[in-house]
């Protein structure tokens, strides 16, 4: 783990109990952080993404931000209307509340610091990650997809198909700094290389 990623991840773990309490069963943690902390523990993640169970993402964002601020968390507006930034002495974390169009079909309850907390299921995260890779081709999204498939004992053929359809992943160096296991990253690199060579 290199650069700024380790302190960000540590701060996410520190603040999760407060996040869980403030989410109040109305927000669902999604994305790489949900996958990494609650499902696979395969890499670190450095931001917090939420889907709302209601139809007003702005109100949900403001409620979360206000609750955290009341707990003494330093939360500030972002240049993007659906985000805010939590500042710590050594780093900062982006918090984003996605629009209601991002649906979570099977949220799961988890216990965090004595509070119940909704987290997206691995099936929901897989669906969202496939959409994300098609849109931005980030290596971390494809890495997450590969390890979801691996956790379910499924072959990696879908990885090769996605590379063929959408192109090779970018930001491999950034991903390398996020992955816990060097062997996992090397396995992913081989899959990407083989897919690029065979075109299938």
Where are these regions (language model features)?
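Compositionally biased terminal segments of proteins
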Residues: 1-200
């Amino acid at each position: 783990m290199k650069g700024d990623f380790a302190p960000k991840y540590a701060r996410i773990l520190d603040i999760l109990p407060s996040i869980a309490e403030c989410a109040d069963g109305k927000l669902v943690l999604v994305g790489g952080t949900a996958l990494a902390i609650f499902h696979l523990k395969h890499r670190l993640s450095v931001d917090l993404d939420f889907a709302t169970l209601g139809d007003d993402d702005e109100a949900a964002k403001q409620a979360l931000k206000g609750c955290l601020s009341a707990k003494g968390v330093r939360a500030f507006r972002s240049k993007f209307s659906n985000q805010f930034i939590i500042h710590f002495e050594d780093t900062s974390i982006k918090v984003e509340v996605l629009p209601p169009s991002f649906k979570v079909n099977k949220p799961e309850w988890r216990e965090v610091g004595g509070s119940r907390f909704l987290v997206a299921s691995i099936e929901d995260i897989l669906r969202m990650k496939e959409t994300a890779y098609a849109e931005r081709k980030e290596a971390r999204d494809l890495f997450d997809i590969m390890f979801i498939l691996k956790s379910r004992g499924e072959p990696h053929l879908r990885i090769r198909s996605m590379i063929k359809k959408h192109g090779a992943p970018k930001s491999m160096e950034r991903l390398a700094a996020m992955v816990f296991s060097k062997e996992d990253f090397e396995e992913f690199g081989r899959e990407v290389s083989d897919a690029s060579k065979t075109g299938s």
